[in-house]
């Protein structure tokens, strides 16, 4: 699919039409004062796995890079969208080379990320910490912020200390700009805490730590 939508592909014009809709939406995001709202834009995520049509095994590194670069340049230069921060977020990787295999270039990425979930086969407090330590030097080399762009434990009904004993350990000593846990659909599919859940009090303890800043703790970030 990627080869068909990048420049020269038979579906390239159709892809441009999709991007026109993306651009219209992004440009509609304004404050009451008329200022554009900044957006963390994370296209083609988890590409180191094969679960998506843009993932490894479904396209080459060259095709992926061409897709990323065209997308950014079209939105920025053709459509005038300047309120996006582009986030590069592979899935679990085995090495720094693996992480950078599909790297579109320093000029095409604003934030480096990682998507990794806590599972029975992949413990976040041990495997996650090792992976974070493995990757933490790349943001310094690229002079860009690093974030935990997707994580969580799905439907946590038993681990009351998950935030302080699992997630906190995974990011210990790692200068992550932000952590994003996935959505809460309902009580049968959730990743974040909610009133009455088993980890509610532990989450409050977690966010009270010195490493964590919530929206209420931050002022003037757009100045």
Where are these regions (language model features)?
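Aromatic- and acid-rich polysaccharide-binding/catalytic face
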Residues: 99-125, 182
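Substrate-binding cleft of secreted/luminal carbohydrate-active enzymes
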Residues: 144-223
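Aromatic-lined carbohydrate-recognition surfaces of secreted/lumenal glycan-active proteins
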Residues: 42-44, 68-97, 144-156, 181-184
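Alpha-helical scaffolding within the catalytic cores
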Residues: 24, 90-104, 126-138, 161-170
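Substrate-binding cleft of extracellular glycoside hydrolase catalytic domains
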Residues: 1-77, 81-83
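Loop/turn elements at helix/coil->beta-strand transitions in domains of secreted/extracellular proteins
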Residues: 31-40, 79-86, 107-111, 141-147, ...
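Chitinase-like catalytic core of GlcNAc-active glycosidases
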Residues: 51-54, 65, 93, 108, ...
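Extracytoplasmic/secreted cell-surface and envelope-processing proteins
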Residues: 50-53, 95-99, 120-124, 155-160, ...
């Amino acid at each position: 699919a990627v080869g068909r939508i990048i420049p020269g592909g038979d579906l390239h014009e159709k892809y441009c039409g999709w991007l026109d809709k993306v651009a219209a939406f992004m440009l509609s995001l304004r404050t009451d004062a008329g200022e554009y709202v900044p957006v963390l834009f994370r296209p083609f995520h988890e590409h180191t796995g094969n679960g998506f049509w843009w993932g490894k095994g479904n396209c080459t590194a060259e095709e992926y890079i061409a897709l990323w670069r065209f997308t950014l340049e079209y939105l920025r230069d053709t459509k005038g969208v300047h309120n996006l921060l582009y986030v590069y977020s592979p899935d679990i990787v085995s090495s720094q080379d693996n992480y950078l295999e599909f790297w579109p270039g320093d000029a095409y990425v604003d934030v480096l990320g990682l998507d990794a979930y806590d599972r029975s086969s992949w413990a976040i407090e041990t495997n996650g910490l090792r992976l974070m330590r493995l990757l933490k030097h790349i943001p310094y080399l690229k002079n860009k912020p690093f974030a935990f762009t997707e994580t969580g434990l799905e439907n946590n009904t038993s681990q009351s200390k998950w935030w302080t004993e699992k997630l906190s350990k995974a990011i210990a000593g790692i200068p992550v700009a932000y952590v994003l846990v996935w959505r809460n659909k309902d009580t049968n599919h959730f990743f974040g805490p909610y009133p009455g859940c088993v980890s509610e009090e532990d989450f409050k303890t977690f966010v009270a730590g010195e490493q964590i800043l919530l929206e209420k703790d931050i002022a003037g970030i757009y100045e």
